[in-house]
Regions:
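Short, surface-exposed ligand-recognition loops at beta-strand->loop->(often short) alpha-helix junctions
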Residues: 9-20
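Residue-level signal for secondary-structure boundary sites
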Residues: 14-16, 59-61, 95
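Glycine-rich beta-strand-turn "strand-cap" elements at beta-sheet edges
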Residues: 2, 8-11, 36-47, 75-101
Length: 101
């Protein structure tokens, strides 16, 4: 598996429920190789978040990243943010738990 972990900050003037609703809408997209996205809101700062996106492999991750459809989704996502996300792409080397395989 392959994916990314992104750190980002939502603008303070953004309605958090509206942000969550828009992110949930992205879940209806049909994206080859896409497994899941998880978004965490930190306890320490309610405007700071982490996104974990999981794909079958690097090729499907890269195909999505290069797609026009993903670029449209990114622009909507970016409109909620203070600045550009910090992206950390990589290979998943371990996954544990009942739903991890």
């Amino acid at each position: 598996m392959y994916g990314t972990i992104a750190r980002f900050r939502v603008r303070k003037d953004v309605n958090k429920e509206e942000f969550k609703q828009k992110m949930d809408e992205f879940g209806s997209a049909i994206i080859p190789g896409w497994i899941a996205d998880y978004i965490f809101q930190t306890d320490a700062n309610s405007n700071e978040y982490f996104l974990v996106a999981l794909f079958k492999d690097k090729a499907t991750y890269q195909a999505n990243a290069d797609s026009a459809e993903q670029h449209k989704r990114y622009l909507i996502f970016r409109s909620f943010l203070e600045d550009d996300p910090e992206w950390n792409d990589g290979t998943i080397v371990s996954a544990t738990g009942p739903g991890s395989k």
